[in-house]
């Protein structure tokens, strides 16, 4: 499924151009019994592995590294053709030569999160104790667990301090967690369309999706691999419901309205008469070809558990007190999944903690997914922030 190369403890040399944007291949960093991953649930995961992509060149002093943290249903293939779908990378609007995250200037790393299903250890991986897929025996993971695993990967490169950590949605949660857990290792942080904790509404939407998966008879209590089946129907419904939250009423009206799908009159049946119905069915059916159902359960649960203030006596500002990281927080006016009020709460906490922070609210009708789309104002803001941070960091052009 992927061209994966094992990297057992070896470090990447500065100046080595590990991947070209046009023809990259995934790498896997393996961590043995001597390098367990401590999890918030109280156990250690060992052995485990992290699949990742890199783009660009790590400079001599390793000061130009950007970690991109992917969103819930994305993976490490942000700027290359996806090995399963054959589609372009998931964040080409932001990552690539001449883009805001300029791969001619920066060394870019993106790893599949722990619990994911594109090469990193997750519930679809083989449990070494049983020789079968982990299924629900896989430990429940959290956003902090994901970040600890990423930090172990960054150590493999010998990178002490990341120039920037960037991410949107679940990726933005990881950005914030990086800045709290490893403030001395993050020079700048770009947190997009996210929050410091999941709202009751978002937890409710996630529970709807999880119940759709678990209600599918083919889910088999998470043991579907052993039964030779897959809960396609349940996962497709979960994706359809979630995808609605990524859009906006205005965007749906502009794109579909009440237009019919390949017909002029209703069929008076339960076929997909409307274009929006056909679109959602496509989103569901295509998603199940590239995503594991149990991973969906685990990653949505990780987002639900996320709450930075909970570890600081309920005082969010305390989490950021004394940080030297430069922050940029971005929200979108039509994002009702992570509304601007959530971003303002982040900014207020950063200000109270004495952090350097800039904030932008982008006026758009594209909804939550605006951060993945061609949104010129957002792209300009990301570029300006990274250029300013790069000047402060003393970065020139990447060495080739």
Curated annotation (Swiss-Prot):
It is an enzyme of class 2 (transferase). Pfam families: Abhydrolase_1. Pathway: Amino-acid biosynthesis; L-methionine biosynthesis via de novo pathway; O-acetyl-L-homoserine from L-homoserine: step 1/1. This is Homoserine O-acetyltransferase. It is found in: Cytoplasm. Keywords: Acyltransferase, Amino-acid biosynthesis, Cytoplasm, Methionine biosynthesis, Transferase. GO terms for cellular component: cytoplasm. It comes from the Bacteria. Gene3D superfamilies: 1.10.1740.110, alpha/beta hydrolase (3.40.50.1820). The active site is at residues 169, 335, 368. Belongs to the AB hydrolase superfamily. MetX family.
